[in-house]
Each structure stands twice: as structure tokens, then as C-alpha cells.
């Protein structure tokens, strides 16, 4: 998950793996062990004065981040599920320099990670689902942006091919009671939170939107 910068159906709420990795430990190509985490400005200054290999890597990457800061900010796309390429934009964070963010998603090309310290989130007590039916795939795509404005925890697409395959499979056939007719596409929308009443209102808002 760290190597791929993975994210799942609830990334709309919780983000990607890189948003939760605090520290990484592992080995460089030289077999030298490392531990990368957030460095305060004073810690970074001390690191920049050392001459060991790990410190030299931090020095080089820090200088690249400073030199190309404007270009990185300008060119890196601001999209929710951007998991391709190296996370150079993670080096421009204002709250501290952390090289761990660059390793996330690098698929082992920069180092071998053996341990990760990650942040955790509480699981919501309540969740409700709304299943939106569409007569065309394009209609479902046009509806996704307004649906996201309702701040759901998840929005998942199932097209007609997937629904038909499920109907042909005895293991899933009896679990499709929520599918009405023969839609070309479904958007399955989840709302979650600590109280059920606001979530039911969200479902009402979703129904009005549809």
C-alpha cells in the first residue's frame, strides 16, 4: 500500500496513503538503514550540516525542492486520486520537511521500506447508502460532481457490464435486490458519521438531487 500510494473507495473522505504516512524506515540501495519523518526547521538545519549519506540525500532533495518549488506548485495536478509518479509536491509542505512522502508511491525505486508509522482515523458509528440509477453511463458521470458536493464518504460506479455479470453469478444473484430494472450505470453513495439523523437528511438531499 505504501509502495503504490494506495487509496480505496473512501479516499474522497480520507485521502491517499501518502496523507497518512508519518514515518518510514528501511534501507537504501547501499544497504544503509534510514528513518525518514517530519523534520522541524531546527532539525533540518542540523541535518544539513552533517555529512553522512542519509543527510546528503536530505540536503540534495531539500535543495531541489527549494529550486523548483514554483514549478512543482504550478505543474503538479490538483486532483484527488493522483497516485502516479513521484510525490515531489509533498516536499513543499509548510509544516516541516518529510522525505517519507516522496517514498510513498515510488514502488521500491528509491528505497526498500520495512516499517511505516501511520495515522489512524476513527470508524464512524453510522453509515447509510443511496443507490442512484442511470439510463446512460454519461448521465452517471455528469451526476458525480453534484453528488460529491454533498460530502459523501464514498461514491462508487458500477456499470451495466458489472451488474449483468453479478446477475449471472449464483453467488451474487440474490444480493442484487437493490437494483431496479436494467440501469446502464449505478452510483453507490455512502454517507457516514456519528449520528444517523443527519445522514438520513443527506439521503433526502441525494434523492432531491437525482
Where are these regions (language model features)?
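FAD-binding subdomain of flavoenzyme oxidoreductases
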Residues: 1-138
Amino acid at each position: 500500500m505504501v509502495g503504490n500510494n494506495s487509496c480505496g473507495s473512501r479516499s474522497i473522505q480520507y485521502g491517499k496513503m501518502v496523507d497518512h504516512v508519518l514515518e518510514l524506515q528501511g534501507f537504501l540501495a547501499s544497504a544503509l538503514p534510514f528513518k525518514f519523518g517530519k523534520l522541524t526547521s531546527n532539525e533540518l538545519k542540523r541535518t544539513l550540516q552533517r555529512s553522512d549519506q542519509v543527510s546528503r540525500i536530505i540536503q540534495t532533495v531539500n535543495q531541489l525542492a527549494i529550486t523548483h518549488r514554483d514549478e512543482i506548485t504550478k505543474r503538479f495536478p490538483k486532483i484527488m486520486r493522483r497516485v502516479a509518479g513521484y510525490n515531489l509536491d509533498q516536499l513543499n509542505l509548510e509544516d516541516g520537511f518529510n522525505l517519507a512522502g516522496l517514498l510513498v508511491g515510488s514502488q521500491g525505486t528509491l528505497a526498500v521500506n520495512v516499517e511505516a508509522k501511520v495515522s489512524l482515523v476513527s470508524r464512524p458509528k453510522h453509515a447509510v447508502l443511496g443507490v442512484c440509477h442511470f439510463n446512460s453511463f454519461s448521465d452517471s458521470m455528469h451526476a458525480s460532481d453534484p453528488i460529491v458536493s454533498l460530502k459523501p464518504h464514498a461514491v462508487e460506479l458500477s456499470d451495466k457490464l458489472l451488474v449483468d455479470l453479478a446477475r449471472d453469478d449464483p453467488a451474487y444473484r440474490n444480493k442484487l435486490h437493490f437494483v431496479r430494472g436494467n440501469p446502464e450505470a449505478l452510483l453507490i453513495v455512502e454517507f457516514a458519521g456519528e449520528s444517523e439523523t443527519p445522514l438520513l437528511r443527506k439521503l433526502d438531499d441525494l434523492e432531491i438531487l437525482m
